């Protein structure tokens, strides 16, 4: 039966109209103001109906940690673990979630589980096979349900993976709440193709600092830099410059970058072992029946026997060997030469290396392979500044065994904001938590301060604009900015053109002089904004409820004076 055919008795249900690609309002009017993003955090889209996750997670069953430890060595036939341990995969999943964070606008990061679960990041080329990592976590998520969010589970899995391999971690803080749909307000770049050349992102590709803000990754579909080199052309010295800029845009310095890379690359391996054309569709394009197993290659059984190993020297990853292996690759006397992976990607291998020094095959422990370094790894060997960071930290703490947990923790925490927004006793008390400090003074005379502000001679515009300029810097993405701390009176905010520096200096100066009675400057700025709104609304009648009967309203609206009063009431309602 077909509802489109009226001549024969067929299905009366219309097909296609609701699924066909139509023309949206945005397509018709591309310059119209798009208000969709105002609804992306609407509670109506949350299926948990007011569930307070941050309160509930405080009672999380401690068995979660044991379950994750068990998962690490429970290799599944549909996606076997490298060396019998899923640690490398879980660490990559956690880091690619946290590492999408951008300091410039606070977007990305692992705060809501969005990079791992939703487009476009769930299908980026750099995130290939991470859907399998999430699928491995599914039995645990199903067991604990709402007691642990996807956002927390993904990052905690990375933490437990390191613990399972012998690393003592800094701790972990729970409390990240999931979102339920892709975000519409994140700019990932203007390119239309995955891995499009980097040139369009830079004013001058030779100067990494000219990358378009707020971007951090060098190409569409990558988390950081191209492992083969700038635009896929190996040149370690050139790549080093882009590494420094990209990781700086994530808030990391050279030492943290070295530690993070060494710690991650030591316990994992490269997987470019076959023809990319043999891969299936990415998760977002895959059939709904295989969404958790998308991208599997048709030659998987043969492909997994031909790995390009990277990192660990032992059949099972061992963090205790990480420093002697990963960092020695950069600082030892090995000479390296360019080669290509089975997939045709540029990489580096030792010119000579003893057989016993080669890492074991991930699946056949009787076979050894040459280790590899990406162009990004080689960049740290040839860059003098990076090597100074390696050598300065090595005598005190092997970067990949101790320090690697610091940048990983800092980037995971970067999207938390205030430490009090997190839960659980494992939360590390570090400065990364961006706490607002001690609470401001209380008990001061509000009426007295308001009177002083009113007598300052500042206009309504000064009062309201300064308060709004202070508050509007708040970023829900990483909880930075906002009125706390009155940072608007300090550099760089005091010099921003959008804050009208001359007007701002006068307003803050007047307010600070009259902020007696023990009030903080931050509180006085906000209070002054409230006073400005009150002054603007002074003398305006408030809306009365219930409204007059419709008939009486219609009669009144024919009268000119009534229309004027009506307008004033509507204005007061909007202002209030």
UniProtKB/Swiss-Prot annotation:
Keywords assigned by UniProt, alphabetized: Heme, Hydrogen peroxide, Iron, Metal-binding, Oxidoreductase, Peroxidase
Post-translational modification as stated in the protein's UniProt record: Formation of the three residue Trp-Tyr-Met cross-link is important for the catalase, but not the peroxidase activity of the enzyme.
A cellular component annotation (GO) from this entry: cytosol
EC number: 1.11.1.21
Residues binding heme b, per UniProt: 265
Cross-link named Tryptophyl-tyrosyl-methioninium (Tyr-Met) (with W-95), sites: 224-250
A Pfam family annotated for this UniProt entry: peroxidase
Tryptophyl-tyrosyl-methioninium (Trp-Tyr) (with M-250), cross-linked positions: 95-224
Cofactor comment text: Binds 1 heme b (iron(II)-protoporphyrin IX) group per tetramer.
Site feature location: Transition state stabilizer: 92
Cofactors (names): heme b
Recorded effect of pH on activity: Optimum pH is 5.0 for the peroxidase reaction and 6-6.5 for the catalase reaction.
Annotated catalysed reactions: H2O2 + AH2 = A + 2 H2O; 2 H2O2 = O2 + 2 H2O
Subunit and partners: Homotetramer.
Family according to the record: Belongs to the peroxidase family. Peroxidase/catalase subfamily.
Main function: Bifunctional enzyme with both catalase and broad-spectrum peroxidase activity. Also displays NADH oxidase, INH lyase and isonicotinoyl-NAD synthase activities. Important for stationary phase survival.
Protein's name in the database: Catalase-peroxidase
Organism: Rhodobacter capsulatus (Rhodopseudomonas capsulata)
Classification lineage: Bacteria, Pseudomonadati, Pseudomonadota, Alphaproteobacteria, Rhodobacterales
Gene name of the record: katG
């Amino acid at each position: 039966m077909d509802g489109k055919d009226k001549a024969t008795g067929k299905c009366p249900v219309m097909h296609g109209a609701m699924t066909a690609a139509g023309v949206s309002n945005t397509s018709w009017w591309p310059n119209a103001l798009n208000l969709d993003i105002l609804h992306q955090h609407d509670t109506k889209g949350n299926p948990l109906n007011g569930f307070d996750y941050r309160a509930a997670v405080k009672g999380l069953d401690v068995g979660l940690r044991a379950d994750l430890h068990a998962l690490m060595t429970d290799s599944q036939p549909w996606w076997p673990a490298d060396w019998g341990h899923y640690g490398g995969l879980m660490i990559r999943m956690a880091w690619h979630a946290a590492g999408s964070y951008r300091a410039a606008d606070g977007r990305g990061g692992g705060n809501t589980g969005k990079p791992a679960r939703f487009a476009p990041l769930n299908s980026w080329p750099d995130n290939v096979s991470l859907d399998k990592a999430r699928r491995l976590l599914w039995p645990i998520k199903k067991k604990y349900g709402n007691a642990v969010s996807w956002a927390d589970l993904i990052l905690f899995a990375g933490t437990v993976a390191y613990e399972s391999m012998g690393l003592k971690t800094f701790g972990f803080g729970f409390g990240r709440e999931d979102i339920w749909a892709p975000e519409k307000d994140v700019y990932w770049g203007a390119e239309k193709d995955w891995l499009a050349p980097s040139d369009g992102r830079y004013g001058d590709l030779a100067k990494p600092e000219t990358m378009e803000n707020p971007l951090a990754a060098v190409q569409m579909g990558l988390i950081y830099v191209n492992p083969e080199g700038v635009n896929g052309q190996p040149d370690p010295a050139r790549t080093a410059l882009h590494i420094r800029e990209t990781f700086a845009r994530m808030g990391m310095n050279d030492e943290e970058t070295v530690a993070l890379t060494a710690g991650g690359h030591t316990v994992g391996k490269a997987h470019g072992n076959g023809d990319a054309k043999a891969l299936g569709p990415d998760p977002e394009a895959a059939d709904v029946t295989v969404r958790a197993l998308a991208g599997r290659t048709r030659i998987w059984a043969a492909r997994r026997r031909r790995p390009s190993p990277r990192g660990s020297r032992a059949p099972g990853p061992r963090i205790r060997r990480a420093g002697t292996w990963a960092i020695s690759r950069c600082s030892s006397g090995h000479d390296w030469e360019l080669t290509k992976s089975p997939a045709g990607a540029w990489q580096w291998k030792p010119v000579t290396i003893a057989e016993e020094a080669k890492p074991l095959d991930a699946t056949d422990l009787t076979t050894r392979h040459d280790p590899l370094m990406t162009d990004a790894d080689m960049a740290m060997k040839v860059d003098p500044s990076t090597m100074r960071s390696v050598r300065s930290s090595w005598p005190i703490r092997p970067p990949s065994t101790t320090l690697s947990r610091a940048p990983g923790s800092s980037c995971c925490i970067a999207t938390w904001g205030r430490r009090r927004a997190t839960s659980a006793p494992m939360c590390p008390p570090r400065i990364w938590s961006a706490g607002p400090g001690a609470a401001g003074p209380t008990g001061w005379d509000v009426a007295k301060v308001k009177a002083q502000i009113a007598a300052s001679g500042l206009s309504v515009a000064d009062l309201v604009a300064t308060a709004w300029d202070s508050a509007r810097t708040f970023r829900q993405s990483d909880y930075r900015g906002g009125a706390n701390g009155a940072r608007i009176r300090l550099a760089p905010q005091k010099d921003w053109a959008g804050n009208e520096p001359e007007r701002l200096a006068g307003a803050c100066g007047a307010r600070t002089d009259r902020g007696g009675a023990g009030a903080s400057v931050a509180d006085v700025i906000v209070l002054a904004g409230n006073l400005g709104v009150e002054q603007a609304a002074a003398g305006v009648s408030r809306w009365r409820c219930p409204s007059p009967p419709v008939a009486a309203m219609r009669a009144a609206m024919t009268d000119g004076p009534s229309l004027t009063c009506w307008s004033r009431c509507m204005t007061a309602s909007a202002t209030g």
